A protein has these predicted regions:
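Hydrophobic ligand-binding cavity/cleft-lining segments
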Residues: 1-54
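Hydrophobic/aromatic beta-strand elements that line small-molecule binding cavities or substrate pockets
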Residues: 8-10, 72-78, 103-112
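Beta-strand/loop substructures that line and gate deep hydrophobic ligand-binding cavities in soluble
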Residues: 89, 93-149, 166-167
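Short, glycine/acidic-rich beta->alpha junctions
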Residues: 4, 68, 102
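A generic structural signal for beta-strand entry/edge sites
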Residues: 3, 82-84, 114-118
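Glycine-rich portal/gate segments that line the openings of hydrophobic small-molecule binding cavities
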Residues: 30, 41-99, 150, 154-158, ...
């Protein structure tokens, strides 16, 4: 079926290797709820459970519990330190999401730039039906884009404050 994507990007004043290590096996592994909060009428992450392995190892899975009481399964697809991280979301318990979305996923690219790291995050959702993409497109391109923007702003602020070599 059809897919819809959105991308956010940011310059982060932290060296790439240090930022990747702080984010992927760090924040993404055990502090996801600190950066993926309620935003743009969408639920945030409440907790994660049942993690099967380190969060920078492909094949590791977990259940992501959301603040609205729903959840989904997340699987690490690829992790290439310090350049790239990809994950896949399936088994959505929310009836509206489960009715619309076959699967979704995110890709993160990290590149060196003057003064730190350029982070690029693309999120893609695959619709279960041709009609579903009509409903899914504005949700992803407007609401989810805003959600991602706010999350990346929190990630940037925290990384620059917490990681050695950051600008603050």
């Amino acid at each position: 079926m059809a897919k819809v994507s959105t991308t956010v990007e940011s310059s982060i004043a932290v060296p790439r290797a240090a930022f990747y290590t702080w984010l992927v096996p760090g924040v993404f592994s055990n502090q996801l709820e600190t950066v993926l909060r309620d935003a743009a009428s969408l639920p945030g992450v409440k907790s994660t459970a049942g993690t099967t392995g380190p969060w920078d190892v492909p094949g590791s899975t977990r259940i992501v519990n959301l603040t609205d009481g729903t959840n989904c399964r997340e699987t690490v697809q690829q992790a290439t330190t310090p350049d790239y991280f990809a994950y896949r979301l399936t088994e959505f318990s929310s009836p509206p999401v489960a009715g619309l979305v076959k699967e979704a996923g995110g890709q993160w690219w990290f590149t060196d730039e003057a003064g730190g790291t350029h982070a690029k995050w693309t999120y893609t959702a695959e619709s279960k039906t041709d009609f579903g993409i009509v409903l899914l497109t504005p949700i992803i391109r407007i609401l989810w884009h805003q959600y991602m923007t706010e999350a990346l702003e929190r990630i940037k602020a925290r990384a620059e404050a917490e990681v050695k070599g950051g600008s603050r």
